[in-house]
Amino acid sequence: MKCQLAQVTDAPEAIRTLKRFVADQALSERRNGREVTPTGKRVAIVGSGPAGLTAAYTLARQGHRSTVFEALPEPGGMMRTGIPAYRLPPEILAAEIEEIKRAGVEVKTAERIESLDRLLAEGYDAVFLALGAHRGVRMGIDGEDSPGVIDALSYLRRVNMGKCPTAGKYVAVIGVGNAAVDAARTALRLGAKEVTVVYRRTRAEMRANPEEVSEALSEGVKIVFLAAPSRIVTKDGRLAMECLRTMPGSRDAAPPKSIEGSEFTVEAETIIVAVGQEPEVPAGFPLSLTGRTIATAPDSMATSKAGVFAGADCVTGPSSVIEAIAAGRQAAIAIDRYLGGSGAIEERLAPPEEAMTPVKENYPSPTAIRNQIPLLPVAERLKGFPLVELPLSPETAVREANRCLRCDLPIVVEEANCRWCFVCQLVCSLRFEGAFDTSKAAIKLLPVVNAAGNRDVRISFDDKCDGCGLCVRYCPYGALTRGSSAGSNEH
């Protein structure tokens, strides 16, 4: 679900930025979790990305001995090798991993696992595969194996591991996902004079984070939309990409059609390919596959081999860090149950929030705009890899947090306060096809006759309601509020 603030203000809540603010405070306020009793069970986790580390930490908190195996010299997976330092400083990642180690997780680096049987023979009671999706997808065009052509993940990996490959003054990037944008911005920081990104669709269809795209453009990255490479050629030792203009079309439809006679050429010293990524499952893992990903049981994340589980990118294909963390937690639940536990992994380091009284007067104004997120000036960014997004001040963080509609709280219905003004239905109808048609609204007002024989109202919500709170915001009589109120109906 997307933040509902975007429905009624200029922008959604800056959730990611607020999470970072809280995390920055927490770095100096670490708390110990509950004491755990060892179960005597051992779990091997293959891959030290967000899914693997999350599963290992969570299983350790359940009392299982967790060991993480990482093929590279440093742990972190895609967080370490695929996300540039200007977005995720390696020292922050290292501090988080140290916290995981202190919870009892053992991390073995530079140790590639090629055989599942080896792990099971070593006495591990369960194995979790969190292999990620680190292999770039090929384009299938002539010349993509030419010297000077590299996939984005390999390029970012070399940079993040300290090898800093020189891309030259003129760089071309194919694709506009997050990896493509990261590679383009990284090339600028390594001295490229001109970086040109070629994408076969429009900006509205881009899969990359819109904020990252905007920052790339502000830094000087050029994006050529509605264009696709047809082949890569080398002439007189110079690399060039021959492209064709494409016709607009639906992102979910077949690849856009090329326009005859629209050829143009982009010359570059390095061409970075970022058209997709996929997992690489070792031959020594005799598992059932679905295409190029590992097949698992949806409810248990179990693979076709007993005792072996898999999750995140190697099962679903490329996803976000937060989705990988969620997969790691789900895997920990499944593995804990497999090992005889309850699967109850919830842990609170703070007391539960007390029941809240109805919220009405503190709702943000419909004109409340998003607070400006401080960014490092472009000239300073391009001198290296400093963090681009600067931390919020405590005052700004509080102002931004106060924009929240509190969608986590139920909508409290006080039918006795309803005056049949229909404002709730009118504003609700704006969210759906048929604006100002109250029959299209997700909130329903039903006339009834009460026990005293007087006309009354019953307020209900249909399945379209996603709790956006528009009705609460605009109800002038207090019939709809947020919070908990004894004796009232809640939705």
Feature map (PLM): residue ranges:
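Mid-to-C-terminal Rossmann-like scaffold of FAD/NAD(P)H-dependent oxidoreductases
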Residues: 214-218, 227-235, 247-250, 337-406, ...
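Rossmann-like dinucleotide-binding cores of NAD(P)H-dependent redox enzymes
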Residues: 65-108, 184-231, 344-359
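Glycine-rich dinucleotide-binding loop and its adjacent helix/turn
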Residues: 21-37, 95-110, 115, 136-190, ...
